[in-house]
Structures are given as structure tokens and as C-alpha cells.
From Swiss-Prot:
It comes from Xenopus tropicalis (Western clawed frog). The gene is ddit4. Belongs to the DDIT4 family. Gene3D superfamilies: RTP801-like. Its main location: cytoplasm. This is DNA damage-inducible transcript 4 protein. The lineage of its organism: Eukaryota, Metazoa, Chordata, Craniata, Vertebrata.
Length: 219
């Protein structure tokens, strides 16, 4: 009997054969211009929901009017609870943005933009291991061929970011004649005016723990 056991224990099961997935180039050719523009931007302001300048300092009386729709696909209670606070912080960053290159005093953010952005953030964070808490968000405003960096937001500083979202916002196209006038004349001190953002935007998602291709979604 011992001899039989020794013979059995001497047998070994061959290890499984693992095929390594080919490394894919992260930035596709169609995104090269966006990556080059955003990579050359000056260092942006950093914000966090857990920092001292948190969303609790925001004075948004009309925020309760914005609500996120229920969806069976977005069953992340923690993310849904966190999202309104994150949108408050995003709105505060856009309101405080240093936009001297646009020669306007402030950006106007439509509620439709924030509502659509909230849905998109939940959608892109749903498959992530830490959900929305693992997001690193870069806010940018496109005008013409330029891309102006507004702020970088770390949703939760206690969590190592697992994915990066670059939100590309656009100015309202109906304001283009006014914008052309701003760029065609010399700047006048104190002549800045408000410019409204378009409800549409584009989001670029990069997984920081994977070599998967860049995900681009436009709303």
C-alpha cells in the first residue's frame, strides 16, 4: 500500500498553458490629435471629494432639480450616491475655471450637461473594480483647435485610481459669431463676458491597470 501511494504522489499534473494577450496600442490614430493636445496642456488644478476644498463648500440652491434616472444596468448604489456630490464639484471647478485664453469672465453650465455627464460617469464606472471612487477625471474645454485644461479631479484620494476619464466640453455653437468676435479683436480690460457650454460632450476613458484600447463615447 505505501508503494502504491508513493507511485501516485510522484505523478504530477502539467501546469495550464496561458496565452499572453497581445499588447494593443492605447492611443489610436483617430485619437492622436486629442492626446497630443491634452498632453501639452499646462498643469491643471487638482480637486478631490475628500480634500479640504470639498463639494460641501458649493452653494448650489437649485441642485435638487437635477436627478439621475434609474436604470437596471447601473446597480451601483455607492456610485449613485456619490455622483451628485461629484457633479457639484465639477460645476464648481468649471465656474472657478481660469479661462483667460477664452477672454470671457465665466462659463455657464446648463443643467442638461450635468445630468447627461452624471449618467455617462456612472456608465463608464460600472465595470471598474472600485466603481466611481476609482476615477481620475480631467476636465477640458475645446475651442477651435485648442484644448484648454480646466481641472483634474481625484474622486477619492483614499483609493488608487483605476481609470482616467478625459471630459472634453464644447462651447455652444450658437455663440460662434460672438466667439469669433472675441478672437478677432484686441482684448479690452474688464470686457470679459459669459460663455455657455454646449450640452454635448465627449469622454475618453483610459484603464490605468490594462492595455485595452481607448474608449471614446460622445453625448
Amino acid at each position: 500500500m505505501p508503494a502504491r501511494w508513493d507511485t501516485f504522489s510522484a505523478l504530477s499534473v502539467p501546469p495550464p498553458i496561458l496565452e499572453e494577450e497581445p499588447q494593443s496600442q492605447f492611443w489610436g490614430e483617430d485619437c492622436a490629435d486629442v492626446s497630443q493636445r491634452c498632453s501639452s496642456l499646462p498643469s491643471s488644478d487638482c480637486e478631490s471629494l475628500t480634500s479640504s476644498n470639498s463639494y460641501s463648500e458649493c452653494d448650489l440652491d437649485a441642485w435638487d432639480e437635477i436627478s439621475l434616472p434609474d436604470s437596471e444596468l447601473l446597480n451601483d448604489p455607492e456610485g449613485e450616491q456619490l455622483c451628485p456630490s461629484l457633479l457639484k464639484l465639477i460645476k464648481r471647478c468649471l465656474t472657478k475655471a481660469k479661462i483667460n485664453s477664452l477672454r470671457c469672465s465665466r462659463l455657464l453650465i446648463p443643467d442638461e450637461l450635468l445630468c447627461n455627464l452624471g449618467q455617462e460617469l456612472l456608465h463608464l464606472a460600472y465595470s471598474e473594480p472600485c466603481g466611481l471612487r476609482g476615477a481620475l477625471i480631467d476636465l477640458c474645454v475645446e475651442h477651435g483647435k485648442d484644448c484648454h485644461s480646466v481641472a483634474q479631479i481625484t474622486v477619492d484620494q483614499a483609493v488608487v485610481p483605476t481609470f482616467q476619464l478625459t471630459v472634453l466640453l464644447r462651447l455652444d455653437s450658437r455663440l460662434w459669431p460672438r466667439i469669433q468676435g472675441l478672437f478677432s479683436t484686441k482684448p479690452v480690460p474688464g470686457s470679459g463676458q459669459s460663455l455657455k457650454l454646449s450640452p454635448g460632450f465627449k469622454v475618453l476613458k483610459k484603464k490605468l491597470y490594462s492595455s485595452e484600447e481607448l474608449i471614446i463615447e460622445e453625448c
